[in-house]
């Protein structure tokens, strides 16, 4: 195998791409005694940015409500730039759908907890995610659809 043919997988950068915190019903909602409900949605996306270079993002949406009123809404997207070359497409899809999100996700967890805490609330700690199971579920859903590239995965 020549150097040009050797498989390449390198992290170029991990960064917080987007983050927002909304408290649309503050300060009145803060006086409520009832415990809020918490809804957490996660998504993974991969997109090429150059030849052999991909951006993989993990997005979290955390919404807490008391009855039908929002206490806070956090949306955050953590991204990583990865160089991935000289691999079969199937392996590239697995790397972008499993390995890359596993690298990016701990940063997202920390940023979400920090953002919520800076908003004046107890931190929300996102649980560990089995990205392999998410990827396999996505592949089963896309079977027969002919999609080769990783697309949005939600849980």
Swiss-Prot record:
InterPro entries reported in the protein's UniProt record: SecB (IPR003708), SecB-like_sf (IPR035958)
Pfam (any one): SecB
Keyword terms of this UniProt record: Chaperone, Cytoplasm, Protein transport, Translocation, Transport
CC terms in the record's Gene Ontology section: cytoplasm
GO terms of molecular function: unfolded protein binding
Any GO BP: protein folding
Compartment(s) of residence: Cytoplasm
Subunit-structure text: Homotetramer, a dimer of dimers. One homotetramer interacts with 1 SecA dimer.
PANTHER family in UniProt: PROTEIN-EXPORT PROTEIN SECB, PTHR36918
Its biological purpose: One of the proteins required for the normal export of preproteins out of the cell cytoplasm. It is a molecular chaperone that binds to a subset of precursor proteins, maintaining them in a translocation-competent state. It also specifically binds to its receptor SecA.
Similarity-based family: Belongs to the SecB family.
HAMAP family per the UniProt record, alphabetical: SecB (MF_00821)
Protein name, as recorded: Protein-export protein SecB
Source organism of the structure: Albidiferax ferrireducens (strain ATCC BAA-621 / DSM 15236 / T118) (Rhodoferax ferrireducens)
């Amino acid at each position: 195998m020549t150097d040009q043919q050797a498989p390449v997988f390198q992290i170029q950068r991990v960064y917080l791409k987007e983050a927002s915190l909304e408290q649309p019903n503050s300060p009145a909602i803060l006086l409520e005694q009832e415990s809020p409900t918490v809804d957490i949605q996660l998504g993974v996306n991969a997109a090429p940015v150059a030849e052999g270079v991909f951006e993989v993002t993990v997005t979290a949406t955390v919404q807490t409500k008391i009855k039908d009123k929002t206490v806070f809404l956090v949306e955050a997207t953590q991204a990583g730039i990865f160089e991935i070359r000289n691999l079969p497409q199937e392996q590239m899809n697995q790397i972008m759908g499993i390995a890359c999100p596993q690298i990016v996700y701990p940063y997202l967890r920390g940023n979400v907890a920090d953002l919520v805490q800076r908003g004046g609330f107890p931190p929300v700690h996102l649980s560990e995610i089995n990205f392999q199971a998410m990827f396999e579920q996505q592949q089963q859903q896309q079977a027969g659809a002919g999609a080769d590239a990783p697309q949005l995965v939600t849980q």
